[in-house]
Amino acid sequence: MENEGWHEGSLLGLSGYYWQSCTLHAGVKLAVFTLIGDDSLSVETIAERLKGDRRGTETLLHALTAMKLLQKERDRFANTPASRSLLCKDSDGYIGHMILHHHHLAASWVRLDEAVREGKPVRERASYSEGEWRESFLMGMFNTAMRTAPAMAEAIDLSGCHRLLDLGGGPGTYAVHFCLRNPDLKATVYDLPTTRPFAEKIIGRFGLSDRIEFVPGDYMKEDIPGGYDATWLS
């Protein structure tokens, strides 16, 4: 009977892969990549700016280098082109929010066996606040949608529409790109009240506060607003 490609080494590699995930999560959570930016910095400088332990900082930096997320020349560390583009907060391609969301989910995933036995969700409160969890989730949705929303806005013809409802719109990424694509369009982002500050931040970033409004509500419990030419459910 074929082993379908699995062997001792590949299974142990799969089992221990979380070591790399946790290393990436730590680098993003500590904003190591953002701190380095376009510079090339020593362990001492990075540890001082992180307010971290020198030995711990050095170990993390070497691990990130082994993963090819940093590059080391002599005694200094710098970002790779990929980490500069994807893991620095000042980059348009930043995906750190989604990575932090994965980090926040990890504490529950290690209790999967418990969830199977008890038949109910498991949510572990760890070293982050509800606000941090919400920000990583919503801004992670923004990170993800930024890769698909422009193409969606181009592919879907809303030229005859004047009012769009973005139902469960989160940070409003799709509403933003539909409005950017259609100058005569105005939109409403409808989502839970706790989503509002994140949506308004994104809408303002794109200069669309005069065309996109946020309406708080729960479409699972309340009537969905009417009077729109089109509705987007993402």
Regions found by a protein language model. Name each.
Residues E2, E8-K29, T34-S40, R49, ...:
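Conserved Class I S-adenosyl-L-methionine-dependent methyltransferase catalytic core
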Residues P171-N182:
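Conserved SAM-binding loop of SAM-dependent methyltransferases across substrates and taxa
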Residues M220-T231:
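A short acidic, Gly/Pro-enriched loop at the edge of an enzyme's catalytic core
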Residues K186-D191:
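Conserved SAM-binding motif I beta-strand of class I
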Residues G160-G170:
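Conserved class I S-adenosyl-L-methionine
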Residues S234:
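Residues lining the SAM
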Residues L208-Y219:
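Conserved SAM-binding strand-loop segment of SAM-dependent methyltransferases
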